[in-house]
């Protein structure tokens, strides 16, 4: 089965002889969705969305994820395999920020790091780093030094990265994605939508592939 769950500081870093402030985000909690929430009333989320794959792909997987969420980390290699097997012409992947800081204390600063990388055009590289190395940084008392290392490995402008992490622009994107998720009825992570349809927690990988194959056969319907 897909790994679903359903649930209701300051760091100064010396770079090149200077001190940069990696700001921590304010903690927020998800507002429970209204009973009549539905895709028909869904909010748009952050624009542009973090997306890869053809805009004309017959299958769109939209993930609402939390980088510190263990089931999200478990879903990550499954999604990478789907990407490899189907390719960008058939599968488009969209990631939406849905940090749950009340249970994952580093979730917001991880989302900030991803958004800061995105401002330099490298969101997906940071996404890969955060999920593939989740078991390491998520256990650290303060993981921001790990995020700086990831940014350096990716080749980001470090001064800009630390300035953007936790900035109002990054926080706005995170909040817009969370609001979209709430409007769709998302209450936990990962929540996965295929062509606008939320998958139930008991969905198996085979069922997901069957659904994707059917959508491809029917031209995305």
Where are the regions a protein language model picked out?
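Structural alpha/beta surface segment adjacent to cysteine/selenocysteine redox centers
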Residues: 57, 62-152, 184, 213-220
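Residue-level signal for pocket-adjacent positions within structured domains
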Residues: 38, 45-47, 132, 194
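A generic local structural motif
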Residues: 45-49, 79-80, 178-180
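A short beta-strand-turn-helix
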Residues: 42-59
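C-terminal cap of thioredoxin/glutaredoxin-like
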Residues: 1-25, 64-66, 148-221
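Short clusters of hydrophobic/aromatic residues that line enzyme substrate/ligand-binding pockets
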Residues: 51-52, 137, 199
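Ser/Thr/Pro/Gly-rich low-complexity linker/stalk segments immediately outside membranes or between
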Residues: 24-38
């Amino acid at each position: 089965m897909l790994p679903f769950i359903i649930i209701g500081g300051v760091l100064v870093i010396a770079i090149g002889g200077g001190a940069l402030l990696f700001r921590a985000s304010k903690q927020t909690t998800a507002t429970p969705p209204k009973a009549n929430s539905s895709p028909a009333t869904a909010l748009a989320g952050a624009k542009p969305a973090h997306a890869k794959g053809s805009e004309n792909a017959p299958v769109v997987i939209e993930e609402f994820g939390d980088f510190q969420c263990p089931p999200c980390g478990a879903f990550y290699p499954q999604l990478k395999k789907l990407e490899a097997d189907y390719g960008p012409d058939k599968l488009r992947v969209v990631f939406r920020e849905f940090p749950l800081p009340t249970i994952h204390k580093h979730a917001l600063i991880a989302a900030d790091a991803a958004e800061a990388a995105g401002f330099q055009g490298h969101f997906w590289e940071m996404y890969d780093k955060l999920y593939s190395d989740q078991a390491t940084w998520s256990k650290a008392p303060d993981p921001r030094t790990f995020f700086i290392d990831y940014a350096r490995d990716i080749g980001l402008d470090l001064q800009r990265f630390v300035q953007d992490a936790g900035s109002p622009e990054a926080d706005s994107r995170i909040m817009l994605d969370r609001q979209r998720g709430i409007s769709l009825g998302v209450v936990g992570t990962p929540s996965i939508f295929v062509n606008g349809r939320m998958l139930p927690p008991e969905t198996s990988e085979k069922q997901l592939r069957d659904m994707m194959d059917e959508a491809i056969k029917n031209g995305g319907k």
